Amino acid sequence: MKDFPKKNIVILGNGISGITAARHLRKRTDRPITIISEEHPYFFSRTALMYVYMGHMPFEATQPYENDFWKKNNLNCIQASVKNINGQKKYLEFKNGETMSFDVLIIASGSKPNQLSCPGNDLHGVHGMYHKQDLDRLESLSHSIKSAVIVGGGLIGIELAEMLHSRGKKVTLIVRENSFWNRVLPDAESKMINSHIEAHGIRLLLETELKAINPSEQGGVKEVITNKGEVIPCEYVGSTIGVSPNVDFLKDSGITLGRGVLVNSFLETNLPDIYAIGDCAEQTQPQINRRPIEAVWYTGRIMGETLAKTLCGKREQYR
C-alpha cells in the first residue's frame, strides 16, 4: 500500500471541479495532493474534442496547462482506474490490484453517458461522445463509416452530427421530441434550428425513437430500426441521450448514494474526510430553485473553490 509521510489528499477525477480544488488547495497548503483519472493524466477541455476530430486543433491544444505545470506545482497526476473505495479504512483499490491510502478523499468523478436501452446497444460502433476514449474510438472507425445515426436532441448530439458531417458522412439525427431542444428553447428558435440542421444536409427525424440496432456479420452495426418501422442502414450509432453521475464504482464503499454521491452544504459525505464535488455530487438539501445535481462547468468550479477553503481551515458552505 502506498503511503505518504504527510496527511495526504487524493482527488478522484481531473475535470474542472477536481482540478479547481487541486489548484486552490495548492495555493493554501503544501500537503501531498494526488489527482487520479482513468481518462487522461492531465486536465483538458472536453468541449474541444469535436474540434480535434474536425481537424481544427491537435489534442494537445485542448490542455490549458503545459504537462510540466503539474510537476512544478507538486501535483501528482496518475492515470489509473479505481475499482472500489474502502471508506472506513481509507484506501482505494485499483483495477490492476494495487491500493493507495488517503487521509482526505475528494470524489470528482464527473458524469457518464447514458446507454441506449434497445437491443444492439453493446455492438461495436455504438457509443457516446463524452470521453477522450470515445474520440479515439470514433477516429478508428471513421474510415469504415459511410452513414451514421445520432440519437438524442441535445448539444452533444448536434455536435456529433456536425463532426461526422464535416467528414462527408451521411448523418441522420433522431430526436424524441417534436422539435430540437424544445425543452430549453422557445418554439420559434427551436424550429429555426430544425431548418438549419436540414439545410446543412443532415436528416432530422422528430418524434422518433430507436427500437433496435441490428448487427453486421462482422459484429458491428448494420442498421437501426425506429419505432415507426423505418430501417436506416448505417455503420455507426452515436448515443447522446444525456448523462448520469459516475458513481457505480462506489456501491460497496460505505458512502451513501442517491443518484449521485449525497453531500451536505459543506460537500461532506456521510463518512469523515470524504467529500464530493462536481457532476457526481448530489445535494441532500439543495437551495430553493436549484437542482440536487448541477452538472454545469461553472458550479463545478465553484464547488472546487469552496471545498478547498474548507479543507484549509476556512469552513464554507457551497452556495
PLM region spans:
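FAD-site-proximal beta/loop scaffold in flavoenzymes
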Residues: 122-144, 217-220, 230-309
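Phosphate-coordination loops involved in phosphoryl transfer and adenosine-cofactor binding
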Residues: 6-8, 144-147, 207
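A Rossmann-like FAD-binding core segment of flavoenzymes
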Residues: 76-94, 100, 167-263, 315
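Redox-cofactor binding/interface segments in oxidoreductases and associated redox assembly factors
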Residues: 94, 107-108, 150, 226, ...
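Glycine/serine-rich phosphate-binding loop and adjoining beta1-alpha1 elements at the start
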Residues: 96-140
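Beta1-alpha1 glycine-rich phosphate/pyrophosphate-binding loop at the start
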Residues: 2-75, 163-185
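Glycine-rich Rossmann-fold phosphate-binding loop(s) that bind the pyrophosphate
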Residues: 13-16, 130, 152-154
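Rossmann-like NAD(P)H-binding beta-loop-alpha module
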Residues: 137-185, 221
